[in-house]
Amino acid sequence: MVLSEVDIVKADPAAASQPLLLNGDADVAQKSPGSVAENNLCSQYEEKVRPCIDLIDSLRALGVEQDLALPAIAVIGDQSSGKSSVLEALSGVALPRGSGIVTRCPLVLKLKKLVNEDEWRGKVSYQDYEIEILDASEVEKEINKAQNTIAGEGMGISHELITLEISSRDVPDLTLIDLPGITRVAVGNQPPDIGYKIKTLIRKYIQRQETINLVVVPSNVDIATTEALSMAQEVDPEGDRTIGILTKPDLVDKGTEDKVVDVVRNLVFHLKKGYMIVKCRGQQEIQDQLSLSEALQREKIFFEDHPHFRDLLEEGKATIPCLAEKLTSELIAHICKSLPLLENQIKESHQGITEELQKYGVDIPEDENEKMFFLIDKINAFNQDITALIQGEETVGEDDSRLFTRLRREFHKWGIIIENNLQEGHKITSRKMQKFENQYRGRELPGFVNYRTFETIVKQQIKALEEPAVNMLHTVTDMVRLAFTDVSMKNFEELFNLHRTAKSKIEDIRTEQEREGEKLIRLHFQMEQIVYCQDQVYRGALQKVREKELEEEKKKKSWDIGTFQPSSTESSMEEIFQHLMAYHQEASKRISSHIPLVIQFFMLQMYGQQLQKAMLQLLQDKDTYSWLLKERSDTSDKRKFLKERLARLTQARRRLAQFPG
């Protein structure tokens, strides 16, 4: 179960009045009479707080942030805003200082509170390097060394992370990401576009909805003019995930203290998460080597004695310990709120990458025997997909249709063409009969059908279907060829030589099978020039035609009471129409079924079988295995990249599943 914000509050009911212990305050707390009760509450709080932060830290360490945004607190501020001093006060260690750009890489600051240990431990890690630090005074040197390694010796910046992990009884449970200070113009040997680069880096982090933006602003400047708060407002216009930190309250001009108090009380520039005010070591105190623990004591005294700011201390809005408590609570609540969505995003990304990785297959083996088995598997998979196409059993997308379904549509069109041919034939027959009666009728008695005329009309009608049949063959051939090519693309896309070879086979066999299919179709229409039908079949068809016409004649309304006698021409035409209709029905049955059968046999069955045999024959030449299995130059890199992402997300899912919340 994921912790809710209510659970966090319940875990430590004294949180509002008992700030987390930092540095020198620890000794004071040990002498307090309520320390045992506080320790029990602290223990309950630790059981819920630390696992949440550790979970996100472990996901970040895995590199999951390369794939998905993780809950975080990003610290931003203008140069000389006091950002480094705030982080030093929270962490208890000195961080790089100086003029110009000091933070040149994003610094992930992991603070882990040790409850029952007095030992201080530190660790710096970046790229593939990691070093344990046993003395807090070594931190600054190691951070500078890391920045020089990553971003160079100059003043350049880098997007690559440096992680500083500190475990101590004097730090809060908290993880922050420190970003470079905002600069407006390049100075000294800084790159001319340094300001743009820094803002781009900062925006990369603060625009994520999963990030709480911690904006550090000096108390002695107009808050509306600060670049850091302006950038935060751009990505968080409602101020829902921004916290303001005012620094250097000792430098506020007299008479303007009330304005600072109004800012901290959220009356000037509203932020949903509000403001805090802190006083860190000044430059003179740093030069005098004032310890961080003593600086905390002085900070507390400063706010207690200040006539305007003491109320802010009582409200829990002043001092580093109160800030640490607020940040920890905000981070935990933010993590708990984000976990369900994060878990779902990781699941979806894992599924998507798994599907994408399947397209790239497995790594090509180096051993020759293993190459043979690998090639056999690839060709067998291809042949199985071809078989599925031939049998109309291939798997298709929701909006797609199977090849056989599309072929049936073409064959249905063929039936319509035949029917239209019959209708057109009636018109032609009528004209020819009129011409015969008017110009060529010889000694035949009225009403007699000229068989040669009947035969000529039948042959012409059927002959007119030959080219449409051949055109249908070409259409179906293209459909099958494209389907086979898609199968090759699916199975051999990354093996470009094998894909090219398969396409060549597909084209060669297509030409051969199309030629054979066309030959048989034309042969069929040559045979159809022989007017023939079984006697009993033809008599039955003719009888049905006559019965149908007789039935239709009875339904017609008579316009004349007297007996109507049709002319000899009309009788002859009616008779020949009946014969043409009867013969056309039987011939149409033959043609409408036989032509699709021929096309299916040559352009689907034989085409597919010959292609499968041709692909298996590739296995006979072992010298071509390496050539056939040659990948595209970027395929191996892409596969490796996807595998690394999949491994990260797999571990992330495992850790989320093990999370005790």
From Swiss-Prot:
Pfam families per record: Dynamin_M, Dynamin_N, GED
One MF annotation (Gene Ontology) recorded for this entry: GTPase activity
The keyword Hydrolase is annotated on this UniProt entry: no
Keywords: Acetylation, Antiviral defense, Cytoplasm, Endoplasmic reticulum, GTP-binding, Immunity, Innate immunity, Membrane, Nucleotide-binding, Ubl conjugation
G3 motif: annotated segments: 178-181
Segments of this protein annotated with the region Stalk: 367-631
Region (Critical for lipid-binding): 554-557
Region described as G4 motif: 247-250
InterPro entries: Dynamin, Dynamin_GTPase, Dynamin_GTPase_CS, Dynamin_N, Dynamin_stalk, G_DYNAMIN_dom, GED, GED_dom
Chief place where the protein resides: cytoplasm
Its membrane topology: Peripheral membrane protein
Amino acids binding GTP: 77-84, 178-182, 247-250
Region (G5 motif): 279-282
Residue(s) carrying N-acetylmethionine: M1
UniProt region (Middle domain), positions on chain: 366-533
Annotated stretches, region: Bundle signaling element (BSE): 341-366
Ranges where the record places region G2 motif: 102-104
G1 motif: annotated span: 77-84
Span of domain GED: 573-661
Post-translational modification, as annotated: ISGylated.
Domain of life: Eukaryota
Dynamin-type G domain residues: 67-340
Subunit structure: Homooligomer. Oligomerizes into multimeric filamentous or ring-like structures by virtue of its stalk domain. Oligomerization is critical for GTPase activity, protein stability, and recognition of viral target structures. Interacts with TRPC1, TRPC3, TRPC4, TRPC5, TRPC6 and TRPC7. Interacts with HSPA5. Interacts with TUBB/TUBB5. Interacts with DDX39A and DDX39B.
Protein family (similarity comment): Belongs to the TRAFAC class dynamin-like GTPase superfamily. Dynamin/Fzo/YdjA family.
Name of protein: Interferon-induced GTP-binding protein Mx1
Species for this entry: Macaca mulatta (Rhesus macaque)
Gene: MX1
